[in-house]
Amino acid sequence: RLLLLCQSHAGYLLLSRLLSRAYRENQYHGRAEIKEAWLHANASGTEGLIALSGARYGEIGLAILQNNLPHAETLTQKWADLFPDRFYIELQRDGHTNEAMLVQQSLVLARKFNLPVVATQSVQFLNAGDYRAHEARACIAEGYVLDDKRRPRNFTEQQYFKTQEEMATLFADLP
């Protein structure tokens, strides 16, 4: 998983073409997904697009969480090459397991490859008080009840839309 942002009108047009193709050719459970090969095959490259690493859900984050740091380095170089001066290592602090280790290793990669970092939030619900309602919705979608001790816990209470001040406080230890 990688987050693409439009940097310019050219980037908007490119992303529109990629998403249109994904809707026509590559849907997974009704969700359009852009294939990495399409980014490599595009004549104008990725000009006009900014890429964020995807934090724990991106290839780099997954490699770090699997303790495969050499692979994480290879992936970091690949994405940095594909998005020159437009690839950011994404950092999140939302209460998931191994979060501190993931942030630390992500910072190591950012320093090693001279990449900027960006603090983001994996927002799943609007307000902090909406967590329980969100969990109920997730249980309904997955066929569980809230009291089921075996149900997956994929979300945390911290995944609400934080204010700028909350994000600044959360990442105050980083530049």
Give the role of each language-model region.
Residues 1-175:
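Phosphodiester-processing cores and adjacent nucleic acid-binding clamps
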